Regions:
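Short, extreme N-terminal segment that most often corresponds to the first beta-strand
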Residues: 1-28, 36-38
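Residue-identity detector for threonine
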Residues: 2-5, 42, 53, 69, ...
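Long, compositionally biased intrinsically disordered terminal regions
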Residues: 105-161
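Exposed alpha-helical structural elements
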Residues: 21, 59-63, 138, 153
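Broad structural signal for hydrophobic residues in well-ordered alpha-helices, predominantly aliphatic
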Residues: 26, 67-68, 124, 157
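Short, intrinsically disordered low-complexity segments
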Residues: 30-105
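Glycine-centered flexibility motif
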Residues: 2, 7, 93, 129, ...
Length: 161
């Protein structure tokens, strides 16, 4: 077991429902995680750096980010710092709803990821159940610039939501 260590990245997945309701799904995963009840959500984060798979597919944070959310726990919102980039994932409600991705890199801004379905900022606002007055434009503004750190961008996103 390799406990999650500082500097290995950061990650949090927010799924609908209680931690107890998500327990079975979480036990079947390839990474060891902890779950905590939050108002309206369950927060899921890593407790070990490595997944139960062989390299190069053993990076726990990437496995957690890419893990599909069961339809009963959707919508889900993932917030990660991976390889120096801020990564936001959303899996909306719906039987075959695909996971969407937004990747922001310092000095470059939002990056195109040809192999990953893009995540419109309006979808982030809609999934999170934002407060009245928060617009998709406000969410887009978080990722408009190219300066700052990935963690700063994610914290700013949470403050907007």
């Amino acid at each position: 077991m390799t406990l999650a260590t500082p500097g290995a990245g950061h990650g949090l997945v927010l799924v609908r429902g209680s931690a107890k309701a998500s327990a079975r799904w979480l036990r079947r995963g390839l990474v060891a995680v902890a779950a905590v009840d939050l108002p309206g959500w369950t927060g899921v984060c890593l407790v070990e750096d490595r997944a139960r798979t062989k390299p190069p597919y053993d990076r726990g944070l990437e496995v957690l980010a890419a893990r599909p959310t069961p339809w009963g726990r959707r919508p889900s919102l993932g917030l990660f710092v991976v390889d120096g980039c801020a990564v936001v994932t959303v899996q909306p409600r719906g039987w075959r709803a695909e996971q969407r991705w937004l990747v922001w890199q310092p000095g470059q801004g939002v990056r195109r990821t040809p192999d990953l379905p893009p995540l419109p900022t309006g979808m982030i606002a809609g999934i999170a159940g934002v407060s009245p007055g928060v617009t998709p434009a406000a969410v887009a503004e978080v990722f408009r610039g190219t300066s700052g750190t990935p963690l700063d961008r994610l914290v700013q996103l949470l403050s907007v939501l």
